Amino acid sequence: MIKRLIAFLILLVCSVYGQTSEVVFIQMNDVYEIAPLEGGKYGGLARVKTVIDKVKQTNPYTYVILSGDFISPSALGTSTYEDKRINGRQIIDVLNAIGLDYVTFGNHEFDYKYEVLQDRINQSQFEWISSNVKRNDNGTTFPFNQNGIDLPEYKVLTVPGYLKNPPLKIGITGICIDANKQSYVSYADYYSSAKDVYSKLRDSINYFIAISHLVIDEDKKLASEVPQLKLIMGGHEHVNMYHRVGETVIAKADANAVTIYIHRLTFDENNKLLDLKSELVSINEKIAEDPKVKVLVDEWVTRAYKGFYDKGFDPLKMVIDLKKDTLDGKDETVRYTQCALGYLIGNAMFDAAKGVDLAFFNSGAIRIDDKLTGEITEYDIIRVLPFGGRIFKVELKGSLLKQIIETGFSQPGSGGYIQYYGLEQTAAGYKVKNELIDEEKVYSAAVADYLMSGMESNFGYLTKDNPGIVKITEPNPNDKDDLCNDVRFAVINFLEKWFIQNRK
């Protein structure tokens, strides 16, 4: 009797669970580092590979997704190997090794010239999907290509149906923000692009999802405009979040694979979606590193370090010992509030420029998304500021200075949020040298060169042609002793002086 009952229960379980199918998406976004962060505690693509393999053991219909921003910026990518700048080769190599399936563009994929981006696309063993980003060649637009084959606007994933039922088909598209406009790129409207793709697929798919690289408000609008989307796997903000708009789930993990999302979609025998469960997984020391991927990561780190030595850096040299103090370079800090790391960089710029009234720069220049503590090396400074960049001495009217400050402070969460040194916020207004800013007075400021390009978010007006600019002094590139030629050397020099003075 007991044996019959057990057999009946087994059959019952099989009949219930055998009629469902599951599709899994493993999502990363904004991954700039291939190795673990915070002294090895978090992140690391060798650990992500371990998670991928574990999930695939239980479900072969597992797809690994990266929602944009990975080729750039990266500290390792700024180094040289085989007489060429690495330019993202290291991360494509490692992403190939972990078994990545699909990506869409992020705005930082366009940090490089077209030829470099094309090389990285061709190097990829995974597929790129984009509905709204096209190649622009003197006004003629057409798809980017991967080894001569046009990048698709969408892919249709096919999963076998239960028994003799038709297969389950999921349409997936990619959408990228137009935040880094380059002459070789054309951007179409996000929402109409997604609608166009859905109109092409609606009669041939069961479900529609998106890989996006938009700000969260745009993701929410996308969900409202295209309610057929069941899942939007997003990026760009660097901080994990989970939202629902109607029946659409929007999810973003933390940058640099500090966390990843695992989305499990369960369907019944009629291909009806029964459940969508999203699990945010911390990638930390408890997860073993895949040995083959770890070897590859270590090889690229060694190659990059040699390139840094050739540029005059000493990656392993200690600059300062913070002991138990911490410099917080996390995006949720540097892009939202004035912080010690921003103050330090501003102070170093102020010191290097000599004789200026204040210093300021865009928080997006800080890319480390990590906390620094203990012994800080030159490589840590490179990680903080992988773009490097020059320091300009800018003479500008007080009216323009106030506009810059107000623009920067009006966009917390953006790379255009400014960090500063020598500026004071009071109830009466902004002060420089203990006096309220006079709109008619001319001030001298140490300014990051990128901020003066007009390319930072909402700073299109800040160029050399602005009437509020009186004079711009650029560093002499032939003067190797001028720290203004590379803000990283300015920061290293400033920290070393501070450490020596305070150690006595």
Predicted stretch roles:
Residues 2-8:
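Sec-dependent signal peptide recognition
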Residues 10-18:
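Hydrophobic h-region of N-terminal signal peptides that target proteins for export
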Residues 19-288, 336-351, 359-361, 391, ...:
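Acidic, metal/ion-coordinating pockets
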Residues 19-22, 33-36, 49-51, 57, ...:
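Catalytic centers of hydrolytic enzymes
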Residues 1-2, 17:
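Intrinsically disordered, low-complexity sequence elements enriched in Ser/Thr/Gly/Pro
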Residues 5, 181, 245, 328-329, ...:
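General secondary-structure edge motif
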